[in-house]
C-alpha cells in the first residue's frame, strides 16, 4: 500500500523541537532509502563512511560538509536552497549551524555493505581510528562507536604527531 505524501514544511514545524542536540536527526521514511531531517547545531568530529552516495538538501540556514578528498581535508559549504550529491566512499563530517535544517537521503545498505566512522588528527590529518559495522539504525548504532573512541585517550592520540584529539565535554572525566 502506498504511503500518502508528507508535507515536509508542516512535518518540520511539528517536529522542530526534536531537531536539536544531542541527536538532532529524525528518520521520516525508510523503504529503499533512508530519508532524514537533520537540525543544527552540531559539533561532530567524526567522519562518516558510506559505501553509497548521500544527497544533501539544505532547507534552512547553512552547513559545511567536511570531507576527506584523496587524503586532503576539504570544506564544502551548502547554503539554504542548495543541494549536493556526495559520491560513495567519501568520508564526510556534516557541520550544521544553529537553527539550520537539512534533508539527507541515503540508500539503504546492501547486505554486504558496512558503514564506518573515522576520526582524523586535527593537527596533521592522520587517520586516528576507524570502526566498520553493518548499519541497522543510525540513531542506535553510532553512539557505542562514539563512546569507544572518546573514552580512550590511546585511540585519540595521534601516532604521527602525538596530538590528543579532543573529546566532547560529556567525556571530560575520561581525561581527568
Swiss-Prot record:
Residues noted as binding substrate in the record, renumbered to the chain: 54, 96, 106
Highest taxon above the source species: Bacteria
InterPro entries according to UniProt: 3hydroanth_dOase (IPR010329), RmlC-like_jellyroll (IPR014710), RmlC_Cupin_sf (IPR011051)
Residue positions binding Fe cation 1: 48, 54, 92
Enzyme superclass (EC): oxidoreductase
Pfam families: 3-HAO
Example GO BP: NAD biosynthetic process
Pathway in which this enzyme or protein is active: Cofactor biosynthesis; NAD(+) biosynthesis; quinolinate from L-kynurenine: step 3/3
Cofactors demanded by this protein: Fe(2+)
Binding site for Fe cation 2: 121, 124, 158, 161
Cofactor note as given: Binds 2 Fe(2+) ions per subunit.
Biological role: Catalyzes the oxidative ring opening of 3-hydroxyanthranilate to 2-amino-3-carboxymuconate semialdehyde, which spontaneously cyclizes to quinolinate.
Entry-linked NCBIfam families: anthran_nbaC, PRK13264.1
Protein's recorded name: 3-hydroxyanthranilate 3,4-dioxygenase
Species of provenance: Xanthomonas axonopodis pv. citri (strain 306)
Lineage of the organism: Bacteria, Pseudomonadati, Pseudomonadota, Gammaproteobacteria, Lysobacterales
